[in-house]
């Protein structure tokens, strides 16, 4: 600004007062939208709560048995398929009955014990036990197959030792490699620590895109955007209050979810700096709000904005590492993950909340998010100014 310093201060004061007034207007409008308030409360509270109750572990998977031997050895093997991982769902008379239960989804595992199972073990002959697993759910199928193989393998090992006359006392003189491992950051490997954090960060992403887009599109639908454009307000003074107001709402929802759901209910530790986490969340919200502004310039109504938001959200989530670890993805998709702001946000979220990491560890993720934020938010502002400026 050039000219008299007092005049420049007055202009600056006027600029910021208009920005504050527009932000207050956005917050008031938001507070009057009961349906939107309920939706946000649901996502930040009940959605994260439900995510914390989702388990990726194998618990009480139904096992049905076709026991063609009916011996003490077969009953002993069946006994090992017990809770918490498995539960016995009954016996079937033939292979086809077990296959039907797999087809109908009434069993996850069918254990098929052949005739002469006990006789072959006592005579030292090799014997086969067939395990059929429903792997339509890949994760559960893999876990069930792994646990079943471990149970059968251990049972066979114990039988071999017994046949060789090896006792538990004599085993103490055999050199063994002991597994001494330590699990960091989530010692009990609780899904209730992992799942709600992921869900919270995804909810923040959804809100950061949808709320600014919905606010701008609502102005277009009501025709009030034209009234704002003929006012003394600049396009920046029109769009920034929407982003600032929705960022404040998201930060409030995040705080409620963190303190009352994640920490209060699921006892998720908050080892790092909460100030750093909220600062990163603010930066991330502005970054993804740029996508919301871009969506608003392409949409004529809220339905179009919602559809376009889904088109943007799904690649961001798939490329974030929230559902699939980067190591399990093809090389090309691993490279594309660095273009997803959510990927860097999740890295920092886990680092701060579970690991207690600071900027000395997370600086590269923060730098990537800053660079993406500059590009995405600037592009959204440019599109908004081009359409409404």
Model-based region annotation:
Residues 1-193, 361:
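Extracytoplasmic/periplasmic domains immediately adjacent to an N-terminal transmembrane anchor
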Residues 42, 48-58, 300-339, 343:
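Transmembrane helix segments
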Residues 45, 235-309, 314, 359-366, ...:
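Alpha-helical transmembrane segments and their short interhelical loops
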Residues 96, 185-189, 321-376:
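Membrane-interfacial helix-loop-helix junctions in multi-pass membrane proteins
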Residues 188-202, 366:
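N-terminal membrane-entry
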Residues 196-214:
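Long, hydrophobic alpha-helical segments
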Residues 215-217, 294, 353, 368-389:
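Junction motif at the cytosolic side of a transmembrane helix
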């Amino acid at each position: 600004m050039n000219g008299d310093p007092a005049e420049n201060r007055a202009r600056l004061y006027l600029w910021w007062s208009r920005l504050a007034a527009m932000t207050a207007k956005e917050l008031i409008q938001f507070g009057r939208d009961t349906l939107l308030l309920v939706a946000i409360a649901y996502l930040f509270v009940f959605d994260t709560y439900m995510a914390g109750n989702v388990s990726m572990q194998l618990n009480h998977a139904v096992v049905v048995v076709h026991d063609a031997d009916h011996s003490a050895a077969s009953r002993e093997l069946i006994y090992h398929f017990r809770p918490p991982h498995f539960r016995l769902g009954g016996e079937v008379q033939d292979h086809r009955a077990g296959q039907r239960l797999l087809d109908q989804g009434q069993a996850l595992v069918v254990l098929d014990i052949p005739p002469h199972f006990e006789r072959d073990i006592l005579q030292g002959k090799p014997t086969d036990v067939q395990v059929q697993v429903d792997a339509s759910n890949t994760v559960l199928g893999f876990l069930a197959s792994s646990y079943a193989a471990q149970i059968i393998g251990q049972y066979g090992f114990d039988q071999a030792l017994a046949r060789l006359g090896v006792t538990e006392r004599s085993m103490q003189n055999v050199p063994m490699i002991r597994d001494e491992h330590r699990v960091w950051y989530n010692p009990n490997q609780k899904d209730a620590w992992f799942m709600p954090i992921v869900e919270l960060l995804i909810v923040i992403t959804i809100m950061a895109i949808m709320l600014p887009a919905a606010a701008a599109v609502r102005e277009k639908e009501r025709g009030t955007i034209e009234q704002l454009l003929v006012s003394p307000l600049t396009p920046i003074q029109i769009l920034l209050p929407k982003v600032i107001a929705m960022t404040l709402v998201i930060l409030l929802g995040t705080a409620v979810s963190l303190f009352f759901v994640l920490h209060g209910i699921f006892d998720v530790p908050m080892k790092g700096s909460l100030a750093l986490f909220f600062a990163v969340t603010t930066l991330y919200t502005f970054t993804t709000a740029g996508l919301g502004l871009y969506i608003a310039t392409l949409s004529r109504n809220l339905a179009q904005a919602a559809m376009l938001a889904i088109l943007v959200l799904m690649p961001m989530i798939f490329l974030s590492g929230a559902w699939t670890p980067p190591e399990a993805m093809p090389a090309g998709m691993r490279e594309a993950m660095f273009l997803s702001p959510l990927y860097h946000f999740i890295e920092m979220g886990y680092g701060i909340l579970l690991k207690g990491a600071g900027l000395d560890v997370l600086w590269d993720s923060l730098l990537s998010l800053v660079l993406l934020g500059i590009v995405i938010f600037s592009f959204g502002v440019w599109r908004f100014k081009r359409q409404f400026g």
